[in-house]
A protein has these predicted regions:
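General beta-strand structural signal in soluble alpha/beta enzymes
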Residues: 95-99, 139-141, 159, 171, ...
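Glycine-rich FAD pyrophosphate-binding loop
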Residues: 1-10
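N-terminal FAD cofactor-binding segment of flavoenzymes
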Residues: 9, 13, 40-48
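Helical element adjacent to the flavin cofactor pocket in flavoenzyme catalytic cores
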Residues: 78, 85-89, 110-168, 172
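Flavin (FAD/FMN) cofactor-binding and adjacent substrate-gating region
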Residues: 21-28, 48-127
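Active-site substrate-recognition segment that forms the wall
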Residues: 47, 55-63, 145-147, 163-244
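Short, histidine-centered active-site or binding-site loop motifs used for metal coordination
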Residues: 30, 115, 234-238
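N-terminal glycine-rich dinucleotide-binding loop that anchors FAD/FMN and/or NAD(P) in oxidoreductases
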Residues: 12-37
């Protein structure tokens, strides 16, 4: 119920167009033009975030970094190569297939996306909130929306037993909070993953990483004053079903 108090403040802080192995599927299901627009929209989002941080002059630990999806299994290399070829179809030179990465791991292959980014999600959330307020916007925390209706050409938002009427409503929650259309509540489930931050006392790598095989583990570095720490996140599973 607070800014960055839940999922938004607990992400890995990666800002990337590389959503796993996805573009090969997207081209097959939606076509090259749709996939190109998807890639361009994500790239524009990275640039917009960078611009907002520059304008607000807030320290959000923003850094341009390359992003990698890698595998240690030879049987998955072909999948990565097909993904790289698919990305090449919509933007030549955006990605490349490589056999070595800066991580101290032996790998079978990886796809690298150039000039992606990482940041501190909570610092950015606060900077964004400040920018909204500075532009005469208002933010209300602890204000749970329970329903949205269309009445007399307006939207009526029900909040904490009160109503707000608006010409336009933008829903930017992690998943839609309205049941119709979509019935998303019938399709969703809770999942759990784990994060570790460690001071490994060594010079750390550049870049952001996630492996293709299951379980997925994500790696990146984070700033802590003069130190760089290792952040590892992964072992996602359906809550209440599996044992670690």
């Amino acid at each position: 119920d607070r800014i960055c108090g839940s999922t938004s403040g607990r992400t890995t802080g990666k800002i990337t167009s590389q959503t796993g192995i996805f573009y090969n599927y997207l081209i097959k299901s939606k076509g090259e033009e749709f996939a190109k627009k998807y890639l361009e929209a994500n790239e524009k989002a990275i640039s917009n975030i960078e611009k907002i941080i520059q304008e607000t002059k807030e320290n959000c630990d923003f850094e341009r970094q390359d992003s990698y999806v890698f595998t240690r299994q030879e049987t998955l290399v072909d999948k990565i190569k097909k993904e790289q070829a698919s990305v090449d179809k919509i933007e030549k030179g955006k990605s490349e297939f490589i056999k070595q990465i800066p991580l101290p791991l032996e790998i079978a292959g990886a796809i690298k996306f150039k000039e992606q980014a990482q940041f501190h999600p909570i610092k950015y959330g606060y900077a964004l909130a400040k920018k909204i307020i500075d532009n005469n916007g208002r933010i209300f925390e602890n204000s749970k929306v329970t329903e949205i209706k269309r009445e007399d050409g307006k939207y009526v938002v029900y909040v904490n037993r009160n109503k707000i009427t608006a010409d336009f409503v933008v829903i930017t929650t992690r998943y839609p909070i309205v049941n119709v259309p979509g019935y998303h509540f019938l399709k969703m489930y809770q999942s759990t993953s784990y994060a570790i931050v460690a001071d490994v006392k060594k010079e750390l790598f550049d870049g952001m990483y996630i492996n293709l095989e299951v379980p997925n583990i994500s790696f990146r570095t984070i700033k802590d004053g003069d130190r760089r720490l290792l952040l590892a996140v992964g072992f996602d599973y359906k809550t209440g079903t599996d044992e670690l």
